């Protein structure tokens, strides 16, 4: 893979042994290379890519690492909100997918996508969705975004047929949109931990 994987990307590996430093025993029993892992936020002195593995149970999540050369396929959150992908999904009747379809009807001034269990289901067609599933949304924001446009997004998200939360990804980390709009500051999740900030588009001094 030539592109650098980013947090929330789903990546497929060339072999099961490509998954490194996994301690949880259930991973060997449940995970196989045909299933993607999700890129997470972390740093490594060996320049490996931080990933997470999801198991069959909600609480089964394991953190590990992979060498970039062992990644053979990548699906970004943005790729999963192509309207044709959504309309032809076997989960099109589920509320989170209906919510994503509703958001595609408006032209937004930023790139956005779907993560979490909805993203995993759309990418794999594995039935991890149900009627009460949340819709996890991601906005890519390399530059500061217009507050009024974000308020419009939040208004539309509040009207979706499911619970939905939006993370905004800046060059320095990600924060919860509702928290930032409500309080004027938010907890920015970075590769080296979280920090409370009112300026998520600025590097911490």
From Swiss-Prot:
Keywords of the record: Nucleotidyltransferase, Transferase
Keyword set includes Cell membrane: no
Reaction(s) catalysed by this chain's protein: apo-[malonate decarboxylase ACP] + 2'-(5''-triphospho-alpha-D-ribosyl)-3'-dephospho-CoA = holo-[malonate decarboxylase ACP] + diphosphate
One GO molecular-function entry: nucleotidyltransferase activity
Residues at the active site: 134, 136
E.C. code: 2.7.7.66
Lineage top rank: taxon: Bacteria
The protein's role, per its UniProt record: Transfers 2'-(5-triphosphoribosyl)-3'-dephosphocoenzyme-A to the apo-[acyl-carrier-protein] of the malonate decarboxylase to yield holo-[acyl-carrier-protein].
Family note: Belongs to the MdcG family.
Entry-linked NCBIfam families: malonate_mdcG, PRK01293.1
Protein name (Swiss-Prot/TrEMBL): Phosphoribosyl-dephospho-CoA transferase
Protein's organism: Klebsiella pneumoniae
């Amino acid at each position: 893979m030539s592109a650098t994987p980013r947090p929330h990307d789903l990546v497929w590996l060339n072999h099961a042994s490509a998954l490194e430093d996994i301690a949880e025993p259930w991973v060997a029993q449940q995970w196989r290379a045909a299933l993607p892992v999700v890129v997470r936020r972390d740093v490594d002195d060996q320049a490996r890519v931080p990933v997470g593995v999801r198991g069959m149970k909600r609480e089964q999540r394991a953190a590990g690492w992979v060498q970039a050369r062992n990644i053979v396929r990548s699906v970004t959150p943005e790729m999963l909100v192509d309207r044709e992908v959504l309309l032809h999904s076997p989960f099109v009747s589920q509320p989170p997918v209906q919510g994503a379809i509703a958001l595609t009807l408006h032209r937004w001034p930023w790139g956005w996508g779907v993560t979490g269990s909805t993203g995993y289901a759309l990418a794999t067609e594995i039935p991890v969705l149900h009627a009460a599933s949340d819709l996890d949304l991601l906005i890519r924001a390399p530059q500061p975004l217009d507050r009024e446009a974000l308020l419009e997004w939040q208004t539309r998200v509040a009207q979706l047929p499911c619970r939905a939360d939006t993370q905004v990804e800046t060059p320095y980390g990600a924060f919860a949109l509702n928290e930032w709009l409500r309080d004027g500051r938010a907890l920015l999740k970075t590769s080296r931990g979280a920090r409370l900030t009112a300026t998520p588009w600025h590097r911490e001094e």
